[in-house]
Amino acid sequence: MLPKLLTSIFGSRNERLLKQYRRVVERINALEVQFETLGDDELRGKTAEFRQRIAAGTTLDDLLPEAYAVVREGGKRALKMRHFDVQLIGGMTLHNGKIAEMRTGEGKTLMATLPVYLNALTGKGVHVVTVNDYLARRDAEWMARLYNFLGMTVGINLPNMSREEKQAAYAADITYGTNNEYGFDYLRDNMVYEVVDRVQRPLNYAIVDEVDSILIDEARTPLIISGQAEDQTDLYLRINAVIPQLAKQIGEADPRTGEGVIQAGDFTADEKTHQVFLTEDGHEKAESLLAQAGLLAEGASLYDAANITLVHHLYASLRAHHLFHRDQHYVVQNGEVIIVDEFTGRLMSGRRWSDGLHQAVEAKEGVNIQAENQTLASITFQNYFRMYAKLGGMTGTADTEAYEFQEIYGLETVVIPPNRPTIRRDELDLVYKTDREKYDAVTADIRECYERGQPVLVGTTSIENSERVSELLNKAGLPHQVLNAKQHAREAEIIAQAGRPKMVTIATNMAGRGTDIVLGGNVEKQVQLLEADASVPEVDKAARIQTLKDEWQGLHEQVVALGGLRIIATERHESRRIDNQLRGRAGRQGDPGSSRFYLSLEDSLMRIFAGDRVKAIMERLKMPDGEAIEAGIVTRSIESAQRKVEARNFDVRKQLLEYDDVSNDQRKVIYSQRNEILEQTDVDAQIAHLRRGAMTDVVRTYVPAESVEEQWELATLESTLRDEWQLDVPLRAVVDKSDAMSDEDVVERVVTAANDAFDAKLAQVGREQFASFERMILLQSIDTHWREHLAALDYLRQGIHLRGYAQKNPKQEYKREAFELFSQLLDRVKLDVTRVLMTVRIQSREEAAQAAEAIEVRAEQISNVTYTHPNEDGSVSQDAAAASAAEGLPLQQGLRVGRNDPCPCGSGKKYKQCHGKLA
């Protein structure tokens, strides 16, 4: 009661905002006469003037009245269209980072030019986001006439464009594109190996058209880039044939005496650390065997830069043969290797070991070696669009989802009043017992409209229902058009003519979006075709255009007299918003129109949520077959059911976001560090930091922190450093000579030895030449382990709900385990990068450059790349990559995290002490 009383006194939040905006509209209107007197060049010159004022410190808010007045005047001259006052209000709403709800036909496309122009003055770029390629191209080409007139550049971002074309599109003041393409470009930008290969600039300001469709309907499906690394089946098989010829050494040699080996061999296997190491003799034998197998050039070393991957596969195969045992670590079922959980003994179907180990086990067992299809990168629309410094949206239907927009995106919804009052008549729903009765009534209504000449738009919830209605109309002899949201350009032309007399158009909810249905048909298209027709003499064009307009005026008046466009819906959608979108197709800009929903108790929504209640009412009223119930209580009951579904879907999306936020925090860290590495020419500091961490970890395995000498395993540590890291550090001799050597001293001695060995390598090759190789190794390692981490997170997510049965909170468990997995990822990167750089043999500067280039080429050799994304109709598509996409197209830098800022993972530690370790 109290909120209603306060609203009646002070007005609603929406009314107060509109009142505030109307005061600015008065200032814009006052400037109109002044700008009308300016010449075209003077008006265009305002753009340069505004930019100078911004550089001098003027804010966009201060410029807004003048900038909007300039755009309005430019629209009158370039487009022959004048922005209404309500469009100015909508433009202010978008500029303030809110969602503008404007009814269909009120001119959202033209409205967007106001905030787009104003924000583009900063030179930081503005992205206009549409639901499909057709609308992106149409709106860009249409509005470019205005932007170009005012001295602004416009780019279009479409799939299949080359990297250079995309860079040009993003470099423009204003860029039009689809939500999917912007997101994929972001992901691809964070997969490149050179800064110059990125296409996006930092994300500044975006206006999302059909914001409800993009940020709500499509939010449950993340954008995923997946692909297969180059097929190496033959490599695994040939290495697998070499392994039985290598003998395992039994016993560990004492570094000082060489004693302790019971049986000499080619490699040692450490069950404790699950690692294998080739002995010196083993190196020579392995090189000889690999040369015989045609995998290694005669006289080449395993540790040459060109053979880094060969060493990796050799060790994976040795581990598969000697450390992973059938029916203990895995089982073979139906020709597949399935991992056994070492703690529970359960089979882990779908899980695969990383680092090529799984393929090595498959080769060992003689089963089919699966070319692993990895997720290369992934992001949800929620997390992508929240990265923009400012975000605005527009749609005809947002108010029903206002809470979700505010809760998830922090976007307030402002309902913009129509330019003219709406006089559309929304009739009560008609509910029938069966589908057959419902469709009979639909056909009868369509026939009645057709016979009197009134245009009809039949809305369906699926392609299947569209085809069913089409079949019924064919049987009834009623001509019609069917649109299924597949061919956007063609369907836009058809829907534009859906307002002509006797037109019957069947369309799924999404078909023809973004195109107005004008009563009497769309004469503008015909006029454009006539103006472009070179065969018609110029002197005749004006007369023929006037004839077309006169004919249209007659048709328009005829349709208005018949009651305007009739909307017939065959089913209620789960969301009231989608139903409102369909209704909004009629009654544009004060035109007449009517709408009615035909339902049956067999409809899915009715059957699940409202059927019993309505059925009871029908039985109580003893309704005969073919008779419909029409009552406000029934419509309210159905809307109540829709609210339940909307609430459930909101919970699903919110839960998805809570889980994705975990990986999103980690994504920010990885992408931020990746971009730092890309932008630096010298990564010595990072490499040195990783080397110290790796050497410390190695030492701590055998010399625990704060331990005494009796607990140290120095002999094993020395052999590990020699075999795995190619470091000869005589620790035992040093310890024996020292009176008081601590475990920290051992760490420092090993770190110093590693630094000295690395510096010697740099001196031989040259620091500058080796820097590029270091950078490539670091990037490749991050990318490889990040992909494996994404797969591990996906696997964790699939089964985490089962923790609820153990009285544990699944979300908390997911956060905890995801944090552990991420820590392991950083450790693996640290060890891998250090191991490669310590053991690789590069003799010259040329060899270093060739090795860096080879790594970059190999990293981009991802085959069968697919792009998974949601469609407008709610389905999910997997598209094969375009050639340009396979090149590794780019995106913007990830959000930067300061070294002393709190870590985004939520641990409470500083970033540099937590997940900033790589930097």
From Swiss-Prot:
GO process annotations (BP): intracellular protein transmembrane transport; protein import; protein targeting; protein transport by the Sec complex
Swiss-Prot/TrEMBL catalytic activity: ATP + H2O + cellular proteinSide 1 = ADP + phosphate + cellular proteinSide 2
InterPro entries cross-referenced by the UniProt entry: Helicase_ATP-bd, Helicase_C-like, P-loop_NTPase, SEC_C_motif, SecA, SecA_CS, SecA_DEAD, SecA_motor_DEAD
Major location (coarse): membrane
Keywords: ATP-binding, Cell inner membrane, Cell membrane, Cytoplasm, Membrane, Metal-binding, Nucleotide-binding, Protein transport, Translocase, Translocation, Transport, Zinc
Residues at which ATP binds: Q87, G105, E106, G107, K108, T109, D516
The protein's Enzyme Commission number: 7.4.2.8
Topology of this chain in the membrane: Peripheral membrane protein
Any single Gene Ontology cellular-component annotation: cell envelope Sec protein transport complex
Span of the signal peptide: none
Record's keyword annotation contains Zinc: yes
Enzyme class label: translocase
Residues engaged in binding Zn(2+): C903, C905, C914, H915
The keyword Thylakoid is assigned to this record: no
Cofactor, how bound (note): May bind 1 zinc ion per subunit.
Family: Belongs to the SecA family.
Subunit structure: Monomer and homodimer. Part of the essential Sec protein translocation apparatus which comprises SecA, SecYEG and auxiliary proteins SecDF-YajC and YidC.
UniProt name for this protein: Protein translocase subunit SecA
